[in-house]
């Protein structure tokens, strides 16, 4: 009995072991199959992603080649058109000159025939008077130059008769030579001249042969056609060198003087009438139908920024700043300096927290966080190892070498000049001569700062190609994002707070997943990226400006290019130089861009947001071009209600623009160097009465400003 039970137990254990072995075998096969499939899946996925990236790069290269070829063809066509226009102009000028010469020759021949007929009739009907005494002249025509037998010629021995009561002059008939005109009776010529005066005032007569009138002696006291007085320079240029040139007689000169005086009298009232109109040129407003045009004059009040010459009603002046108001518009904004924050170096960027309570600034090696209400320093963030790592990365990396003139050259990209790539900070650095105090590698400028939506974290981008995520309260780095191959110039958080977009000189825009610290999407373009922005609300779109003068808008989920806003649009209203700042309007329907071409532009994106109708402009069109800055535009921002646009420039000024009309409302001069960065605060950190904005400058200052709307005077 016991043996039977034992055998049964052993058999059961064997069966269980067999089942266990079978289960383990199946599990191993399943794991092997899963791993193999996972590897195949990952391999195929990576291969497809690589192919997509290759296709995208190929498309971008083709696009770049197309643009270059198009530019070359357009330049060649431009030169050819210019050549054709010049040739047509020359042909037209020659045709007009030939016609005038023919008309003048016909008129001279007619005058000669009429005078010959009159003289012939007079000599046939009136007895010959006593011959006047012969006159000797150095300009008399030699006998060898005369020809006998001409039907209309007079004998050499005969002289013109003296006619009693006749209006004919008693002077002898001159020979018409090169650059001289045939004589006519004075009173008759004066009448003809007054009736037939035509421009140009100095008539050029085609040369005639000395044998036109046979035997007619020449005299120094000759008479010519009176003509309208020409400018002295014209007379000097057209004065013939022939000694036989005729002179204008006293009567002709009197007629000329009278005509000239009358002409001047007619011109002077026109000039006097134009003077009052010029007084109103200071009141220039942009015509509504020219809002998008790039070629517009700068409003006159912005041309001369000397506050001493401006009336008190059109300015506000203190020891630290002054404001010039547009005289053509009512004064509706009052701006005051709230706090001035001194820094040890150039302030490259300023950015408010989402609630507007804090302001972050970036300068050399450090990032500061200030409380807006009182300007107190909340935190100073600095990575002590950053400068050393930055220096080592430059000296140890074989693919990157540092050269003079602040130029970085890499083996995989084209040469990028720091001054061209980062005029915002580098222009100020050049002015301050910062690179003379230390080697370029010892500087580590914080190019961009951005608060997380909840205000707990701060992202910073710098020259060492790293993005640091700081815990503001603990003043510690919680994450470092690596992947860019050149300086990082711009950052922006997504509204959800779990993603970040960055733009770099390595010609890429990258979207980072902050939950994993990995790059989730890379967008490549043909030139360096200078600025990026995320659309408000859902963060559906990202915009980027670059050195190729274009603003691109992508779908942040798919990476598809939605819009390309540049000078190649149908209207030709795009930027003419590199774009250095972009920002979405608060409603997300438009993009504002600032460029080195000294302009600010407002681009319509309503069709891209699927909210367009027949009354709205086409997607991607430039609605307004704001002209007023006299140097590079380095930063742009919009107010909370999108009523105004602010722009900072290398001309040291901040302009308030009326968004709809395109007119500048005021110019704020509050810095002694380039205004590199401008930011507008959300909320009301200084109370409901004031709105707040901040500026960062190459004068090593960041300033917090407050403004409010006032009732028009």
Curated annotation (Swiss-Prot):
Pfam families: Tup_N, WD40. Belongs to the WD repeat TUP1 family. Present with 5840 molecules/cell in log phase SD medium. The keyword Transcription regulation applies. The keyword Acyltransferase does not apply. It is found in: Nucleus. Residues 124-153, 181-197, 254-264, 392-409 have a biased composition (Low complexity). Acts as a component of the CYC8-TUP1 corepressor complex which is involved in the repression of many genes in a wide variety of physiological processes including heme-regulated and catabolite repressed genes. May also be involved in the derepression of at least some target genes. The complex is recruited to target genes by interaction with DNA-bound transcriptional repressors, like MATALPHA2, MIG1, RFX1 and SKO1. WD repeats lie at residues 342-371, 441-471, 483-513, 524-555, 574-604, 628-658, 670-706. This is General transcriptional corepressor TUP1. The gene is TUP1. Residues 124-278, 387-409 are annotated as: Disordered. Associates with CYC8/SSN6 to form the CYC8-TUP1 (or TUP1-SSN6) corepressor complex that is composed of 4 copies of TUP1 and one copy of CYC8. Interacts with histone H3, histone H4, MATALPHA2, RFX1, SKO1, PGD1, HDA1, HDA2, HOS1, HOS2 and RPD3.
